[in-house]
Amino acid sequence: MNIRDLEYLVALAEHRHFRRAADSCHVSQPTLSGQIRKLEDELGVMLLERTSRKVLFTQAGMLLVDQARTVLREVKVLKEMASQQGETMSGPLHIGLIPTVGPYLLPHIIPMLHQTFPKLEMYLHEAQTHQLLAQLDSGKLDCVILALVKESEAFIEVPLFDEPMLLAIYEDHPWANRECVPMADLAGEKLLMLEDGHCLRDQAMGFCFEAGADEDTHFRATSLETLRNMVAAGSGITLLPALAVPPERKRDGVVYLPCIKPEPRRTIGLVYRPGSPLRSRYEQLAEAIRARMDGHFDKVLKQAV
């Protein structure tokens, strides 16, 4: 038995499909299947109920999967401890980002991070919050950049910046010539929202409910770009995070207005596992991002007025 065998087993438990599990481990399906059989022979116990339709684990198999996850987490800690003895900001680093942050933040920070930490090998992964936190907990990811939510409190949270949200309206909307919009003016309005699973949806809904607004349930978007296009088409209005707002106050049929009294904001932070030996690496990364983004949103809000 070796570490790779345990990785195959955990991958199969996660995907419940031999081909997808093999793809995630970057091996052929026969290789993964053969190693699982060897593991069963070595342990003298059946781990799987093999059917033609789906992968079913035996009770012994599920117990071994749970223990394998624990072993793999500890192996990752050992590797982190070893790498900590060398240069802190070098080697591989797997970073997770949520879809409402990654595409808009990365252009601002990636060139700077490559220049500041040239020996750091960054691997970027995009997924929704609950998926990223599960991958962080399992050790697949080293750290995650997301909007801080209750679920992230189980990890170490390092705030990076507070990101304002702006109101996006179509160009011939009655408010199009305003300089800003008090949140109270949204009372009675129905706003377009992202679909379930996006933390931004919950945050935007919270601000809307406090203002007396509601969700337009006729449509739920899968991305911020879809929301933006729906606004441009005159189908409604929405709140967009400032990172996703262009430099111009008006572009492609959409007008962006700052909201006031109160200003809706979300906190973007870097999250990592408690007790990680690479704490100083994450703290240095967070400080570099924080310095790069300092003052950025003041410029965005001024341009929107």
Curated annotation (Swiss-Prot):
Consequence of changing residue 219 to A: Increased sensitivity to H2O2, reduced oxyS induction, wild-type repression and DNA binding under reduced conditions, probably destabilizes the oxidized dimer
Induction of its expression: Negatively autoregulated. Transcription is negatively autoregulated by OxyR binding to a short region upstream of its own coding sequence (at protein level).
CDD domains: PBP2_OxyR (cd08411)
DNA-binding region: 18-37
PROSITE patterns: HTH_LYSR (PS50931)
One GO term of the biological process aspect: DNA damage response
Activity regulation field: Activated by oxidation of Cys-199 resulting in the alternative formation of cystine, sulfenic acid, S-nitroso- or glutathione-bound cysteine.
UniProt effect for mutating residue 266 to A: Partial H2O2 sensitivity, reduces oxyS induction
Disulfide bonds: 180-259, 199-208
Deleted gene: phenotype: Hypersensitivity to peroxides. Increased expression of phage Mu mom gene, hypersensitive to H2O2. 2-fold increase in adhesion due to overproduction of antigen 43 (flu).
Modification note: Disulfide bond formation between Cys-199 and Cys-208 significantly rearranges the secondary structure of the protein and activates it. The reduced and oxidized homodimers have different forms which may alter oligomerization and interaction with DNA.
Keyword tags: Activator, Disulfide bond, DNA-binding, Glutathionylation, Oxidation, Repressor, S-nitrosylation, Stress response, Transcription, Transcription regulation
Result for mutant: residue 218 to D: Increased sensitivity to H2O2, reduced oxyS induction, wild-type repression and DNA binding under reduced conditions, probably destabilizes the oxidized dimer
Modified residues (S-glutathionyl cysteine): 199
Matches recorded under Gene3D superfamilies: Periplasmic binding protein-like II, Winged helix-like DNA-binding domain superfamily/Winged helix DNA-binding domain
Residue span(s) of domain HTH lysR-type: 1-58
Residues annotated with Cysteine sulfenic acid (-SOH) modification: 199
Molecular-function annotations in GO: cis-regulatory region sequence-specific DNA binding; DNA-binding transcription factor activity
GO CC annotations on file: cytosol; protein-DNA complex
Subunit structure comment from the entry: Homodimer and homotetramer.
Task of the protein: Hydrogen peroxide (H2O2) sensor. Activates the expression of a regulon of H2O2-inducible genes such as katG, gor, ahpC, ahpF, oxyS (a regulatory RNA), dps, fur and grxA in response to H2O2. Represses transcription of phage Mu mom gene in a methylation-sensitive manner; MomR binds to the mom promoter when it is unmethylated but not if it is fully methylated. Binds DNA in the upstream regions of its target genes; more than one site may be present per gene. OxyR is inactivated by reduction of its essential disulfide bond by glutaredoxin (Grx1, grxA), itself positively regulated by OxyR.
Cited NCBIfam families: PRK11151.1
Note: Oxidized OxyR can be reduced and inactivated by glutaredoxin 1, the product of grxA, whose expression is regulated by OxyR itself.
Protein name as catalogued: DNA-binding transcriptional dual regulator OxyR
Organism: Escherichia coli (strain K12)
